[in-house]
Amino acid sequence: MSLTMCVMEFGAVRLFFNLFLVVVACGVGTAGAQSYYEPERGTATRSALMDAIRPHVEWDLGQPIEFVVNDLRVSGDVAFASLAPQRPGGTPIDLRDTPWYRRNWDPNSDFMDFMDGTHTEALYRRMRDTWVAVHFAIGATDVWYAWDEFCPEYRSVIPEWCK
């Protein structure tokens, strides 16, 4: 085989290999594409999601509540939120001064040691035109929303937890 033929074959192999890499990269990019979006501040969707969880959090932590949104994801009719409740103006919430604490206080219990403060996660479902906070936890120390019972329905908004 001549040197020219070898160079041409090498060029064809290299071209094929480069095309293969492009196809694989595009396929991986598509397969791993994000399936959710974050509603922008001030949108009706974001407000509706905060309004859906607010009564639950106020029942446990008292009124009034503001949320620092750490993560908010929507995909179709499901959503996920990771929130940090606080009092207006950024005042932290003292768990010992909440309705939840007064309802559950036990001098023989150290349950406060097993909480992650007021950090709140919620899983939502849109029913007709209304967002409903179907599952939520305040102060959870585990990734409860990645349990097998939730993943089939909420995988699109928490794909990193639902493999």
Task: Indicate residue ranges for each PLM-predicted region.
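Surface-exposed patches in mature extracellular/periplasmic domains of secreted proteins
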Residues: 64-72, 134-136
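Short, low-complexity, Pro/Ser/Thr/Gly-rich segments in the mature regions of secreted, periplasmic
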Residues: 155-163
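Mature extracytoplasmic domains of secretory-pathway proteins
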Residues: 70-119, 125-126
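Bacterial N-terminal signal peptides
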Residues: 16-27
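Short, non-transmembrane alpha-helical segments in secretory-pathway proteins
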Residues: 35-64
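Sec/Tat signal peptide C-region and signal peptidase I cleavage site
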Residues: 29-33
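Short beta-strand edge/turn micro-motifs at domain boundaries
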Residues: 119-154
